[in-house]
């Protein structure tokens, strides 16, 4: 979609009716109406193998699946995982400490209607050269919620090309590996919502934005000399809302929060805070609404009519929320625990890394014990009794009165559905 004026990037890009069922309770933004595998089949991941029956790679290799887990732990992969269309990945269903996928990256290119929740994607030094930890080149309607992504060799989390209606919310985008060390590109005219995320320890592109973007209540910590939020740096036209974010300098930070904008980048900005002094206290100030404070972008007087959050936090509230809940936070692993501790040092800790060994690698996870599931339909017997389904009949994909499958109703009950 080629944009010529802001009116073209309004809710028209968010074409579903406002009454459409959202991906899960709490889904927001451009990607809120992704359907995932709701009209397909359940696939239960039963092992930590790189491939083969019962593996995560096999689970996402076909369309129209809801993926749940009867195992927890670290899945070590050699090649990139390529995700098919209309796949839901519900990492919160894993027992123990959940799921980490380590060793290479993921492609969600053309993975229309993806829903991804509560999983860790950690690429690492041994991953494919010049590739992202999580990359999307094209595709429509995707939402990533409570995902921890780190150690990309090119970008860590990037969205490019003919991609549209995508949300990344409540997630951690961390530690792109040197020498590139990039948070990621967010450059599509089709609409990307970034809500309540943590960008941390990336030298540059935290993120770099072109096209249509809603950037609300994010925390950016310890960006390097390449820049924090990079505003287009392009002859192309961009239109963004930038609201209620907090930028906190760390040991690696040597430039201001916003860089490399120009008059082609049109930004509505409101209540963004900046703490540059690295003094061990969160004591930032509101950035004045001027082009010079926002990297030279053209400042707009009216907010773009994009799908917004239900509740806009203050920047301080966003920091409190992100440090408590962002990423695959049902159980925080050792990596995310270290990253959050860096943020809470308020400028005194953190660094750019070239090898994940600096963080102790992906760590170890308690695999837990899967609950009894007699019929193998993905819902534990005890939960089926509470739902009113039959523990002896494969009925998890039947629709509940809410419009979700019974499997989704159960999985959604395992984690919070609101953030305020």
Curated annotation (Swiss-Prot):
Superkingdom: Eukaryota
Protein name stated in the entry: Probable pectate lyase C
Positions with a binding annotation for Ca(2+): 275, 277, 279, 281, 286
Family classification: Belongs to the polysaccharide lyase 1 family.
Major subcellular site: secreted
Record's cofactor remark: Binds 1 Ca(2+) ion per subunit.
Residues making up the signal peptide according to the UniProt record: 1-20
